[in-house]
């Protein structure tokens, strides 16, 4: 197999370089600047080549083995076009896998960083989390079968993404003319919708800046309208990786919190850095203490 784990540091660095490129997209000069042979553009080109090399290697090895591993790549390799009957090309598979790398790396890392920070600032919630993990897991590592049983762990992750949604704003094109209050949005307009703003709306979330995982009990969830919470977007363009992200996040939180307490090392609150994702400015430096 393509040894992705041994290349994790290099792949992570390549992803970071490519994500930096997206931060310049709001500039009116983007179309011009992207074509110049600047050091930044050369770094992005090298990073893209590095990711392509790894991804095409994975695809080639999977095609050669013809093994169904029950994962997303196996599903895509077996997918057939309903009309033509053909499968996905290597380039199509590459595009899908690149999306998973880019969308799944930065967003999940940010969600987990904010979660550790919030738990370090809310010892009562952290204690409840530890209690659930001790009860459900004992000394064994969590598995996929445990995801549904780790209800409080899921509430912790849900509330973390309410407080600090990794994707804090998204754009949608209006398919028709629509009136909002005194304003008319013409058909074809690009409308920016902010998860961060909606997730801090006091109408739906009293004390919106308070970290409270119990907002997400079944009863409390039922009291709020559907799109008062949408960290993964919604509708036909809902994030394709949502279910994977939930399972991945819950299992990582459970695995680490089962054995460690996280202490926030820096002085003062974390500053927000709203780029293409909502990052903690300068990162979040944590101290691990064995439970």
Where are these regions (language model features)?
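C-terminal domain-closing interface element
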Residues: 40, 44, 153-169, 282-291
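Cytochrome P450 catalytic-core helices
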Residues: 107-132, 243-259
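Cytochrome P450 proximal C-terminal region
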Residues: 13-16, 134-142, 148, 238, ...
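Cytochrome P450 heme-thiolate monooxygenase catalytic core
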Residues: 1-110, 128, 277
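Conserved cytochrome P450 K-helix E-x-x-R motif and the immediately C-terminal K′/meander segment
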Residues: 53, 57, 140-181, 202
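Cytochrome P450 heme-thiolate "Cys pocket" and heme-binding signature region
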Residues: 98-99, 103, 141-145, 169, ...
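Conserved cytochrome P450 K-helix/beta-meander segment immediately N-terminal to the heme-binding cysteine loop
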Residues: 193-221
